[in-house]
Amino acid sequence: QAFLKRYDGQAVASTFRSVWLPAVARRQDWSTLLANWAPTENVGLRCAQLTARQATGKADAQWTSEAQDLWRKAGKSLPDGCDAVFAVLQTQGGMTDALRWERVDAAADAGQPSVMRSAARGLPAADLALATDYASFVDAPSAKALNWPRNERSRRIATDGLQKLAKANPDATEQQLPQYAQALGLSADQQAQV
């Protein structure tokens, strides 16, 4: 801590903090972590800070908002250290269906079908089935999509899946695009994205 105070504001302090705070989190020394916290883009450290706040009785409305923000913006898999944060968020009623869908959408945009499936757990059965279909399509487009609801989310997922297919097999994508465009009402812009 003395090192951080001595070199506060310098790059060396930031580098030291990014190495030292994960060790503090592994020891579950929450008060030390919170006392030496500085905002960071490191998702693992952000989850550790949220865990520290929750463990010290500071899981307030701001905590909920920050945990939800971390969840919704993560289109890719998150560190295991975030699992406890999201479990508490679920227990406190902060993990809404709309929030789950936001992460499903972000994961689709990132081309991460496994994250889509994981984010969808906890949705009502019909929504879970649709989200699973969406994830399967992003993984490998199929004709099942022709029966999806004709809404913006379906169009977005179809565009994401077809973009991925276009990288691997442009000819197949070119042949299949018209049927998806017609069935789901893809706009000219969405078709051009593919």
Question: Where is each model-derived feature located?
Answer:
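Alpha-helical solenoid repeat scaffolds
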Residues: 1-194
